[in-house]
Every structure is written in structure tokens, then in C-alpha cells.
Amino acid sequence: MGTLTVTGRARSMGALFAGVALLNTATVGLSTAATLIVAAGSGPGWSGLPSVANVLGTAAGAFGAGLLLPGHGRRRVLVAGYGVAAAGALVAFAGALTTSLVPLLLGILLVGLGNGGAQLSRYLAADLYPEERRGRALSNVVWAGTVGALAGPALMAPAADVVTGFGWPSLSGPVAVAVLATAGAALAAAFLPRHVPLPPEKPAATVAPARAAGVARPLVAMVAAQLTMVAVMTMTPVQLESHGHGLDVVGWVLSAHLFGMFALAPLSGRIADRWGPRVTVNAGLGVLALSTATALAAPTAHTSGLPVALFLLGYGWNLVFVGGSAQLSRDLAPETRSRVQGTVDAVVWSASALAGLGSGQLFAGGGYALVAVVGGVLALLPLALLASRDGR
């Protein structure tokens, strides 16, 4: 891979960080508004469709970006991906104006395709640095999610006020923000240096992720963490609402979760660089198990137990996500790296769809306690499997 100057590296990191922050801002606001639009127009039973569209789009986008990066370079791929996201946001905006389900979901799917490129940005950041600094580099890009987690919800009410002044539906406001944010992400990606060659890949190479060296461990752990995190997170608002708590309590608990997911990512990166990706992943799985035990012990303690549980849920996921990503950046051969990374992200995001659908069934069958128990088992299972494998 080509060598970057300090200025070129800083420019690349700034562009990658800005693109991820803006895409996350767009996704948070768009998904929230779309969920409310669908629930109001088609009933609560269909309100999960925007989330499914976003997850499927992101999985496909990550896979496609991983295939395209070796031959076309990071700048072209990210600009194109974010451009598709901007076009999708425009389509979704048209759907929001007319409360039409088809363009709304199609737009979210296209935004998800662009988000797939944003997900791979952490690996691109890691490639800019020597091995001993890759954990911190990719964690800084993961931290960009904090911007979206804060800015997306914060901009919803002001955006609604602006669009109602034009006589448009209030929920089209966050979608309008998504249009601007995705366009900004494409502009940010255009500032990436032109000549930052990626490790070459063999065009005919096909890699089975579970068999590639260094992939099985992070893949299993990242899928388990995603299943646990999404299942418990998705059902927590339902649990709170069923016990009479309002949106203010839901927002407080989810804020603790989002803080854990993103804000401490640089700390996770330092842990990965200091003690290694494997230790980081194992610690994350342990924290996830602790979070589910806390949720099980205090399922209605909205001022103490649940915020702590959801914070631990977010940070446990972050440790696994950063540690697993660092291991993929370190252990994969250059000729297969981006392709396998894209495939792994596609599998992980597909797990999100499974967790989102399955958690509702678990909650209906056994309540929040069953969701927490299954989440804890999912978190501990990789530790047991990988320990058994290491012992052989």
C-alpha cells in the first residue's frame, strides 16, 4: 500500500470521520421519522419495515463496497455510495411528503446501501496506520457514530418546525435533514486523496469468510454481539412502555445505550492496541453477558438498573465491534482483506434483521426476561466455543 504523508493521513481521517458522522445523522433521523410515518399510515404492525429496509440495504452495501474497493479505490467507492444514499434520501423525502410507503422504503433501502460504505470506513482508517495503531484509528471512525446519535434526534424537532412553515408534513423534516446530510457525506468523501492505493486483490478470488484465516473468531463474536445488542435494545422501549413509562424515560435509557455504543470507542481502540483484539473481544462478550444479567435483575428500574444495563449492552457491543474489526484488519491477507471485511459486515448486519424480528417473538412468548436470558446465552456461547477450540 502507498505511503501517506502526515497531511494526507489527517485529510483522509477527516474525510472518513465526516462521512460516517453525516451518514449516521441521516440514518438516525430518517429511520425514526419513517417508523412513525409507517405506524401512522399502516398500523404499528408494519412499523418495523423501515428498520428492515435499512438493515438489508446496509448489508448489501457493505458486501458490494468490499468487492468494489480493490479495483476502484476508496474515494470513488465512497463518493458513489454516498451519492446513492443522497438519491435515496430524496426518494424517501418524496414518500414522506405524500405518506407513500413504497418510495419511503425504497429510499431507506438506498440510504442503507450508502451506509454500507460508511461501515467499511473504519477498515479504511485502519489501513492508513501501522499495525500497532490500527485499533485506535478504526475506533476513532466508530466514535463518529456519536455525532449521529446526538445530532439525529436533536435536529428532528427544529427540522419539523421548518418544514411545517412550508405547509409540509412535520415528519418530512428529519427526512429533509437526511437529504442534506447524505449530500454532505458525498462531498466529504470527495476530499479523500486521489492516490491512496489499497492492497491488490486477485479478481477471481472467492473467499469463504468462515474458513479464511483469522476470520472465524471475530465473525462468530461480532454476530453474537449484534444479535444480543439488537434484541435487547429493540425490546427495551416496549418493556418500558408496557410499564407505563413515557418517551422521556425511553429517551433517557436509550441515550445511556447510545453513549455506550459509540462514545467510548477510542478507549476500546486503545485496549485493542495495548492488549490485543482477542482480549478486547472476550471482554466485550463478558460485558454483554453482564448487561443482560443486569436487565434481568432490574427489568423496570428505569432510573438505575435499566440505564446501567443498556450502557453495558452498548459498551460490550463496542468492545466486540472494535476488537473484531481490529483483528480483521490485522490478520487478513492484503489480497483478500476488503472483500472479506465487506462480507463479514454483510453477515453481521443480516444478523440485525434476524434479531429485530426474533426479539418480538421472544418478548411475546416470555416477556423481557426471556429476551435477556437468550441474549446472555448468545453472548456467552462464543466464549465457550472459542475456549473449547483453543483447548484442542
Task: Please place each PLM-identified region on the residue numbering.
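A late C-terminal transmembrane helix in Major Facilitator Superfamily
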Residues: E335-G366
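C-terminal transmembrane helical hairpin of 12-TM major facilitator-type secondary transporters
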Residues: R278-G324
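Helix-loop boundary and gating motifs at the non-cytosolic
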Residues: V6-A59, A216-A221, A225, M229-G251
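Intracellular juxtamembrane helix-capping segments at the cytosolic ends
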Residues: A34, G116-P130, L319-L332
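C-terminal ends and interior cores of transmembrane alpha-helices
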Residues: G83-T98, V287-T300
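Hydrophobic core of transmembrane alpha-helices in multi-pass small-molecule transporters
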Residues: A21, L101-G116, G305-L319
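C-terminal membrane-cytosol helix-exit motif in multi-pass small-molecule transporters
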Residues: M156-A157, D161, V179-E201, L385-R389
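Helix-to-loop junctions at the C-terminal end of transmembrane segments
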Residues: G61-R74, A160, A263-P277, F363
